[in-house]
From Swiss-Prot:
GO cellular component, one term: bacterial-type flagellum basal body
GO BP, one annotated term: bacterial-type flagellum-dependent cell motility
Domain PilZ, chain residue ranges per copy: 132-249
Keywords, sorted A to Z: Bacterial flagellum, c-di-GMP, Nucleotide-binding
The protein's assembly and partners: Monomer. Interacts with the flagellar basal bodies.
Coiled-coil regions, chain positions: none
Family statement: Belongs to the YcgR family.
Protein known as: Flagellar brake protein YcgR 1
Gene Ontology molecular function: cyclic-di-GMP binding
This protein's record includes keyword Nucleotide-binding: yes
Role this protein plays: Acts as a flagellar brake, regulating swimming and swarming in a bis-(3'-5') cyclic diguanylic acid (c-di-GMP)-dependent manner. Binds 1 c-di-GMP dimer per subunit. Increasing levels of c-di-GMP lead to decreased motility.
Gene (name only): ycgR1
Length: 264
């Protein structure tokens, strides 16, 4: 599938505004490789925008060569678009991956035959933009299969004390914890919980750093009072973020299936 937008204004890509979206750029080679390979594994549909974006075509990422730092894309159906992509100054790829907007900028593409299949080949991008603000979507933890978080705090005498709290909700940007009110002094804003163990059903245990952003008190259905401790992830590697996003997407699919009567 291909198209042009002759009568439409040029698309405005977030990747062209690093000053506004700096926190969403991934530049570490390992993270770039991880997401490129994830696009291949998922068979994600990408839109390849040529130069200013008025001409574009749909494609998929067929393979990634980490050693040669090259990506292989399915060619466009129209030969003129393949030629335009080869002669372009830049190519902007856009996609959605588990509710997250992905953008990356490629140099001009070249044609290459791989096992008799015509492909478009480009070098690895220098950065990947992944946009998911925390407020976009939060998943409430299931009471049947709760997410647990083990927190380690340093006591005044220098020893470590550990607590295991239920996660109330989780997103790609952070989570909320249910904690006893007796620990309110340990859960003040900007408190940092390093190497917390996040046990996500079906995914495994992740080590995460959490910074407290907000603490409030609430009453549970049983009448007891608890703290709701809102935290953000700090320096979360892309591979661990992908596990969290995969869990969120899976639970949402299961809930939608139950709501539509497709699952018991």
């Amino acid at each position: 599938m291909s198209s042009t937008q002759e009568d439409q204004p040029n698309p405005d890509f977030e990747i062209d505004h690093p000053e506004a979206y700096s926190q969403y750029f991934l530049t570490a080679p390992r993270e770039i490789s991880f997401y490129l390979n994830l696009l291949v594994k998922r068979g994600s549909l990408l839109t390849a925008h040529i130069d200013d974006g008025k001409a574009f075509f749909l494609t998929t990422m067929i393979a990634v060569d980490d050693e040669k730092q090259a990506i292989f894309l399915d060619s466009a159906q129209a030969d003129e678009l393949n030629t335009a992509a080869k002669n372009a100054h830049r190519i902007t790829l856009t996609a959605k991956l588990d509710r997250v907007k992905i953008q990356l900028r490629l140099p001009p593409l070249r044609h290459q035959l791989v096992d008799g299949q015509k492909m478009l080949v480009a070098a690895f991008p220098q950065a990947i933009l992944r946009i998911q603000r925390r407020e976009f979507f939060r998943l409430e933890s299931s009471s049947a299969h709760p997410i647990l978080c083990r927190i380690a705090m340093e006591a005044p005498e220098g020893t470590l004390k550990t607590f295991e709290w239920n996660v109330a909700d989780i997103s790609g940007g952070g989570l909320s914890l249910n904690a006893p009110t007796s620990l309110i002094n340990d859960c003040q804003r900007d408190a940092l919980f390093k190497n917390s163990r996040l046990d996500i059903p079906g995914e495994g245990v992740l080590l995460v750093n959490l910074r407290v952003r907000k603490t409030s008190e609430f009453s549970a259905e049983n009448g007891q009072h608890y703290l709701r401790v809102g935290c953000e992830f700090v320096e979360l590697p892309g591979s661990r973020l992908a596990m969290i996003e995969r869990y969120i997407a899976r639970i949402e699919r299961e809930r939608k299936a139950r709501d539509s009567g497709l699952a018991n």
